[in-house]
Every structure is written in structure tokens, then in C-alpha cells.
Amino acid sequence: MAKKIFYTSEARDKVLSGAKQLYDAVKVTFGPKGQNVVIEKSYGAPTITHDGVTVAEAVELPSDEENLGEAIGAKLIKTAAQKLNKVAGDGTTTVTVLTYNILAEANKLIAAGVNPMELRKGIEDAGAEIIKGIEKSAEKIEGNDSKVAEVASISAG
């Protein structure tokens, strides 16, 4: 089977559209006051959750030729959430919101003529600076049971 190759602004718009569909479903779960989402399944009772990765994994877009770009966009965001969940176990809604917004802004910049490779380098450089800042301001909690419990309580919602 031949592979479908997307390019130009039409392709970017399709990818962004799929990413936005997943983003819209997940963003409502953001933060301690995040809303619940009802997920209908083909079997059993619906699932009610405010867990971003659970919502992301439930979003399924058609991947036929006409909708492939949208399916790819949703998969980009879903993959970021799944990877973070595997590594950190939390923050999946945050990574969904950040990833979608970076993608949306990058799409605007590329449409305005910014070189995509230079844009990628800028995003990677900014990410490295953010990591340095977080590491600098991070507080070690290993061995401090009350701090560990406090962080776990915040994370649990």
C-alpha cells in the first residue's frame, strides 16, 4: 500500500485540527478544579474521569485517507501525554495543553515564513533553558516524608 504524504499549509492545518480535537477533550481536566469527562465505551458502563491521559487515550479519530492528517495530529498530542505518564505518572493534561499550544504557535510562525528547522532549534533551546531553571529552583524532598506526602496529596487532587 502506498504511503500518504502530507505537505503544505493544508497538511499543517489538518494536523493542527486533529491536535485541537484531542486538546479540547483533555484541557477541561486541567488543575485541581478540572472537570470530569464521561467516556462512552462499546461495552459496559461509561467511565467518568478527570485524568488527562485516560481522556487522551479514549479519543479516537478516523484514520482513513481523508482524515489521516487529523488522526496524526491527535496522535502527536496523545503520544506526548502517554510518554509523560509513563515517566512521571502525572502532568499529562499540562503536557497536552503545552504541546498543543506550541504546535499552534509554530504553525502560525511557519505560515508567516519562519524556517521550520530554525523554529525547532529555538524550541529545543528554550526547553533546555526551562529545564535549567527548574533544576535550579527544585527542592529536594527525598527522605522528607512530610514533603513527599504533601506533593503526593497535591498530585492526587
Residue ranges, per PLM feature:
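N-terminal glycine-/lysine-enriched basic segments
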Residues: 1-157
